[in-house]
Each structure stands twice: as C-alpha cells, then as structure tokens.
Amino acid sequence: MSHNQQAAQPSSSRTQVIEREASPGVLTVRGAAEDEDSNVRFTEEVVDNEHMDKKKSKICCIYHPPAEFGESSEEESCGSDDSGPESDEGDIPNARKPKKKNKGKCGGHRDPSPNAYERKPRPKKN
C-alpha cells in the first residue's frame, strides 16, 4: 500500500495596511419645513375659560412678604400674651423662654390679606 503524500507548499499572502488621515465628519441638521398653515383651530363645542373666574393653574407656593427685622412667625395674633392656664412655662424649668413683646395691643400690625388663590370665590349673582 503505497500512499502518495504531497508536501504542502506554503502559500504566500501579504497584508497591506493603508493608513489614511481621518477627516472630521460634518453633520448638518435641518429643521422640518415650516407649515404655513400651522394655526390652532377650535371647534364650536370648545369652551372658552377666560373671564369665567376659573383658576387656570395649580399654585405650589404663595408669596408672603418677609416679616420686619425682629419679628418672628410665632408672634402672630393680637391679644395673645400666653399668660393663661394653657401656658407651658412651668414644663421645662431651665429652658430659655422667648420674650413676648405683644401684651394684647395691636401696634398697627395686621395679617396680610389673602391673595386671589387664598380667597374663596364670591357666588355670581344671576
């Protein structure tokens, strides 16, 4: 049994690497074509809420002007001097107690009037 074997001849292959300078890409962005007839149109059944005394948005914060220097938010009402039986002055013997300036006299100070969102709406007269 004779077996003929052929010797594998090495094949020659070449890899050639070509380096090119990378040019910066330019991306041009264009907006969509403007539609000349892009006005909003309403049908007859749409209700106009203007001038109907309806609130149009939710308000998260209501601005109250800052108190004058030296005033605190605890000194709110006229006539409260905290000298009644509900006073907690005897509860904590060594605690610092704030001095109360308000001795039942309103010195021309009054609470700010509520703004439009704090006021209850008046019923309409028909």
Curated annotation (Swiss-Prot):
Residues 96-107 have a biased composition (Basic residues). It is found in: Nucleus. It comes from Yarrowia lipolytica (strain CLIB 122 / E 150). GO terms for biological process: glycogen metabolic process; intracellular monoatomic ion homeostasis; mitotic spindle assembly checkpoint signaling; regulation of protein localization to nucleus. It comes from the Eukaryota. Residues 1-16 have a biased composition (Polar residues). This is Type 1 phosphatases regulator YPI1. Residues 1-126 are annotated as: Disordered. Residues 71-91 have a biased composition (Acidic residues).
